């Protein structure tokens, strides 16, 4: 798990080292915490029904999504409007290739690369390269 989580949550600032290319879409905005030296390319979507925390030196390719909200598998519950939310935490020095999707409840460790087109459904440890759908570790770095 990332050491950045608690540090980033305390800051909750956007400073001169934060650059988000337009368009950028989020649900609320106030549930998002950016570390220093954050960069996101075009078409970033963050569905921040609950907290989304990014560490320092995070780079995000184009067309990426971070989704904290989900819906039940059970049809009756889903049709009743039930929704759940689980936080997403991204460590320090993480690079996301383009078209990556990160699903609710995921933690991504420090010094990690997530390959283009990946769908991250489970936690990814520190110091690895992970790719695919579902995203899996392919190499330690």
PLM region spans:
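Flexible, glycine/small-residue-enriched loop-and-beta-strand segment within the central core
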Residues: 24-34, 39-107, 133-135, 140-141
């Amino acid at each position: 798990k990332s050491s950045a989580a608690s540090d980033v949550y305390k800051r909750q600032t956007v400073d001169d080292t934060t650059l988000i290319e337009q368009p950028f879409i989020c649900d609320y905005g106030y549930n998002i915490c950016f570390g220093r030296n954050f960069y996101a390319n075009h078409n970033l979507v963050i569905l921040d029904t609950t907290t989304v925390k990014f560490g320092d030196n995070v780079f995000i390719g184009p067309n990426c999504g971070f989704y904290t909200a989900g819906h039940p598998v059970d049809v009756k519950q889903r049709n009743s409007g039930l929704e759940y939310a689980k936080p997403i935490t991204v460590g320090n020095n993480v690079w996301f290739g383009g078209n990556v999707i990160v699903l609710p409840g995921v933690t991504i460790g420090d010094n990690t690369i997530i390959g283009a087109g990946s769908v991250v459904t489970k936690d990814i440890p520190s110091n690895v390269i992970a790719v695919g759908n579902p995203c899996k570790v392919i190499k330690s770095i």
